[in-house]
A protein has these predicted regions:
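Acidic/polar loop patches that form or flank catalytic/metal-binding clefts of enzymes
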Residues: 234-238, 407-408, 607-614
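Bacterial N-terminal signal peptides
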Residues: 7-16
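Catalytic domains of carbohydrate-active enzymes that cleave complex glycans
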Residues: 262, 282, 287, 291-292, ...
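Catalytic-core region of carbohydrate-active enzymes that cleave or remodel glycosidic bonds
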Residues: 544-644
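Aromatic-lined carbohydrate-binding surfaces of glycoside hydrolases
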Residues: 110, 130-132, 142, 151, ...
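Short, glycine/acidic-rich beta->alpha junctions
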Residues: 63, 144, 157-159, 219, ...
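Extracellular and organelle-lumenal recognition/adhesion modules and their flexible linkers in secreted
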Residues: 21-144, 156-157, 170-172, 179, ...
Length: 761
């Protein structure tokens, strides 16, 4: 009865009490606006009520750490042209952290119409964090949060600092004091947690309306700066600065030297076209000198995968300046067979080739000086809709006057002594010296398609410039190429930062192929770090790389103990699956998810995190050509392909593969050139908090290992905190949704690190 009376009294005297939430702190309230604040591991919804309890803004941070908070305006009437500023942070002794170390961003909202999963909900969610560069408006009765991030300089003195945030609008002003305590330790420039976030440069080019590579390089540099500020690394900082390779001694391009299906000798030349939206062809790599006054005949042996399959042999003509002569294609469409047979094309110097009163081919034009030879396994068309596989052997281009074959290497045999690979690192080195010479990035991805299958019909096997694994030619090229990369990285001090990530989420059926590729890499360049993402981590595949990266939900701590103990690195990744209640990366999820990922990583001894993309803003196959998705209006990540018909879209989840927003809010109509950086998301800012939490934990470990005899009380306290209990998480489905639990432990770690630092002086 007394409880009922108490609740009734509170509702009468304090009607807002019923709706007051249990996070955040009221700063001040008047008829114009309520001001309240919250730490930055909360998503403040538009209609969240102001908290009942009061509290001043107090934050703590190490040197070289970023720490944030949110101030929320909840107007009693609409406010316009609100300006916001912050003063320098000052100690009573006069030490100062200048205001330029504070980023002020507006928390904006995106409308989730399609929830990411069955346990997600539609609604307006906070996510984009654009810088406040001009006054803004605040709607009556709607929360309008402002996000502050303070970067503490490495040279700052420890102790308490004080600053004032000022909001101004016509007829209204509010001053908000802020207290910052700088702890007496410094975070390292390079985070202990490695990371790999994909970044699509072509997407940036499109959405920023950039005209050339120089503009793209300028904008990418701003993205990379933002990455460093967030303590994350892109997978490839050298997207526009590739390692270039040139293979020498190979005379045919586009097909495969097939050792398993031959007419004579060691090889035939297989050309395979498996695509319905592009044409495939084999081509002699050089132009052949011809005399249009002489008769020629092309003769070859061929077979096709299917009986009566049509294939084509074409000859193009060029001037003495090696310019293509249009409308002068020569050649023949042939009917193939599953057994070898001989075909030919005759090119008369005078008379055209006529069939049923139709001119099929005319003599070489009088200005022709060169010709090229093209082998198609089907009949090429404008859309590339045909498919097929054909083999060619003993191909000859004969000058009938002299009887000489003017096409070298038409037998498709290879002199292995001629093979070589030239590597050009000049562009890569420019980027590496820019982005690896300064702290911030923890590593970079190397993709090697030479370990993947090529345009080859047959067994699933690695392919390098026309040669398949198992041939002496492949072995030689692979040895030169991979060892060349290894040695160059080692010579420049970059070895160990790379991870060779060439295959993604292999299925069990692919394990033999994956093992072969990893063995090639280890045999040719044993110092390179091999990497794999694993949807089903297990003993069948875990031993073939130096780093394994399962999806977080599939990580098995018990299974992985032995491999980690042996020194194998373990990372984890988040993606479109699984949805809530698992830890996930979606906009329509609890804010704590991104931070919890790092706490779980520490508990499980994981040393890296990966997300497939950070700016997947559009899937071209899901919309009409030239129409771009506007993620400011629809934050769902769509994906084409996956066995869906053209124009259909798989829904990956809101914000999957998308942690940054383009500055262009109307990509289909706004053609302004944006030479600016990205708009970060609230989720990536919270992830940075987790990365810094992880730094705290590793630094505590280091202090524990190097503790002095008189520091055992500190050691015991540190070990207790680092033994993460079930009040934080049980597994990736059972974890606290209350950020205050993480912040409590962070507070304890910060104080301990300060004490260790003080006693080690």
């Amino acid at each position: 009865m007394n409880k009922i009376w108490l609740w009734s009294f509170l509702l009468i005297i304090f009607p807002g009490f019923l709706f007051a939430q249990d996070f955040g702190y009221l700063i001040k309230s008047d008829d114009v606006c309520e001001l309240w604040w919250a730490e930055n591991t909360y998503k403040i919804m538009k209609d969240d009520p102001a908290p009942f309890k009061k509290g001043k803004i107090t934050i703590q941070a190490a040197r070289n750490e970023s720490e944030g908070f949110q101030i929320v305006l909840l107007p009693g009437k609409s406010l316009e042209n609100i300006s916001v500023s912050v003063s320098d942070f000052k100690q009573k002794s006069g030490n100062t952290i200048e205001a330029r170390n504070v980023a002020i961003r507006k928390v904006e909202y995106v409308n989730v119409v399609k929830p990411s999963g069955i346990f997600h909900k539609a609604g307006w969610y906070p996510d984009p964090l654009p810088l406040i560069e001009k006054p803004f408006n605040a709607e009556k009765g709607v929360n309008s949060p402002v996000w502050f991030t303070v970067k503490v300089p490495k040279g700052a003195s420890s102790g308490k600092y004080y600053a004032t945030v000022v909001f101004k609008s016509a007829g209204w002003q509010a001053s908000v004091p802020v207290e910052l305590e700088v702890w007496n330790f410094t975070l390292p420039d390079n985070p202990y947690m490695r990371s790999a976030f994909g970044l699509y440069s072509d997407m940036i080019r499109q959405y920023h309306n950039l005209s050339n590579d120089e503009e793209l390089k300028q904008v990418l540099d701003k993205y990379y700066t933002c990455f460093k500020e967030l303590r994350i690394s892109p997978q490839k900082f050298y997207d526009l600065y590739p390692i270039r390779k040139k293979v020498k001694g190979v005379w045919w391009d586009g097909g495969t030297f097939d050792p398993d299906t031959v007419f004579s000798g060691r090889y035939s030349y297989q050309v395979s076209d498996n695509s319905t939206n592009g044409n495939a062809e084999g081509q002699f790599s050089d132009l052949i000198s011809i005399d249009p006054s002489r008769p020629y005949i092309l003769k070859w042996w061929a077979k096709t995968l299917k009986k009566n399959q049509q294939y084509a042999v074409m000859v193009l003509c060029y001037t003495s300046e090696k310019k293509l002569i249009p409308w002068q294609m020569k050649g023949m469409i042939c009917s193939g067979n599953i057994s070898w047979h001989e075909d030919s094309v005759y090119i008369d110097p005078v008379n055209p080739l006529i069939f049923q009163d139709m001119v099929l081919s005319r003599p070489f034009p009088h200005n022709a000086a060169f010709a090229s030879v093209h082998l198609n396994p089907d009949v090429p068309d404008r859309h590339g809709s045909q498919t097929g596989t054909a083999w060619f052997d003993n191909f000859r281009f004969i000058d009938l006057k002299s009887g000489k074959n003017i096409l070298p290497r038409g037998d498709f045999e290879q002199n292995i002594e001629d093979l070589d690979v030239e590597l050009d690192f000049s562009a890569f080195d420019l980027a590496a010296k820019q982005y690896l010479a300064t702290p911030g990035f923890t590593g970079f991805r190397i993709q090697v398609p030479e370990l993947r299958p090529g345009p080859y019909y047959g067994k699933r096997v690695a392919w390098f410039n026309g040669f398949i694994n198992g041939t002496a030619e492949y072995d030689k090229l692979a040895d030169i190429y991979f060892k060349g990369i290894q040695d160059h990285l080692e010579a420049n001090g970059w070895l160990g930062k790379e991870y060779v990530y060439w295959i993604d989420e292999p299925k069990h059926d692919d394990y033999t192929f994956v093992r072969e590729g990893m063995d090639i890499l280890h045999r040719t360049a044993p110092k390179l770090t091999r990497f794999i993402t694993e949807n089903n981590p297990g003993p069948e595949i875990m031993d073939v790389t130096e780093i394994g990266c399962p999806v977080l939900a599939k990580f098995d701590p018990e299974k992985s103990k032995e491999w980690i103990a042996r020194g194998r690195g373990m990372w984890s990744y988040l993606m479109t699956w699984p949805k809530a209640p698992h830890v996930n990366l979606f906009i329509d999820s609890d804010a704590i998810n991104m931070r919890m990922w790092l706490w779980m990583s520490y508990k499980y001894h994981l040393t890296g995190i990966l997300v497939w993309s950070s700016n997947c803003w559009n899937a071209e196959g899901c919309s009409p050509h030239g129409v771009f998705q506007n993620i400011w209006e629809d934050p769902m990540t769509y994906m084409d392909g996956n066995g869906l018909p053209d124009g259909a879209a798989a829904e990956y989840g809101n914000g999957d593969g998308m942690f940054f927003y383009p500055p262009n809010r109307d990509p289909n109509n706004d053609k302004t050139k944006y030479l600016t950086g990205p708009v970060p998301s609230l989720r990536i800012e919270i992830l940075r908090e987790g990365i810094e939490d992880y730094d705290y934990m590793i630094m505590l470990e280091h202090f524990v290992r190097s503790a002095r005899p008189g520091q055992q009380n500190l050691v015991r306290a540190a070990e207790k905190i680092l033994d993460i209990k079930q009040d934080v998480f049980v597994n990736d489905q059972e974890y606290t949704k209350d950020p205050r639990i993480l912040m409590k432990y962070r507070q304890q770690m910060g104080k301990l690190l300060s004490e260790f630092s003080n006693k080690n002086l």
